[in-house]
């Protein structure tokens, strides 16, 4: 990686973990698309727009990881709500385990390399 490419690296990492972040956000609560966009916007480093979230939600639905239902809204037209499917729970559990191992390995390597050459 060359100097100045860190922004691209962060974007690639975010793109890789975003589906699992969305699955995690649906773990305990059904949400509609704009609600997810707004919530992600409040998390440092996860800012994303509707042009990213809606295609992602459609892909997660096609993969059977989320399910949808239409619900009436107090204001405006009905909204499509997304909830975590059983397959989504399994995918999130597998990702979480893999993420924890990878994160711990990288943290360990960075800590050791700061103290002594590897």
Where are these regions (language model features)?
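Short beta-strand "wing" residues that participate in macromolecule-binding interfaces
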Residues: 68
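Basic, amphipathic "hinge/linker" alpha-helix immediately C-terminal to the N-terminal HTH DNA-binding motif
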Residues: 74-96
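Short, hydrophobic-biased segments on the C-terminal half of alpha helices
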Residues: 54-61
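Short, solvent-exposed loop/turn elements at beta->coil junctions and helix N-caps
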Residues: 9, 71-72
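Amphipathic alpha-helical dimerization/coiled-coil segments
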Residues: 2-4, 90-118
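Glycine-centered, phosphate/nucleic-acid-interacting loop/turn motifs that mediate DNA/RNA or nucleotide
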Residues: 64
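Intrinsically disordered, low-complexity serine/threonine- and proline-rich regulatory segments
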Residues: 1-17, 95
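N-terminal helix-turn-helix DNA-binding core of bacterial DNA-binding proteins
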Residues: 10-54
């Amino acid at each position: 990686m060359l100097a100045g490419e860190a922004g691209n690296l962060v974007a690639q990492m975010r793109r890789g973990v975003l589906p699992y972040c969305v699955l995690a956000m649906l773990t305990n609560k059904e949400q509609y698309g704009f609600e997810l966009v707004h919530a992600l916007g409040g998390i440092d480093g996860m800012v994303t727009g509707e042009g990213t979230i809606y295609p992602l939600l459609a892909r997660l639905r096609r993969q059977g990881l989320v399910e949808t239902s239409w619900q009436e809204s107090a204001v405006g037209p009905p909204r499509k709500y997304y909830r975590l499917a059983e397959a989504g729970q399994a995918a999130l559990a597998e990702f979480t385990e893999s993420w924890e191992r990878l994160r711990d390995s990288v943290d360990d390597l960075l800590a050791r390399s700061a103290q002594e050459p590897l």
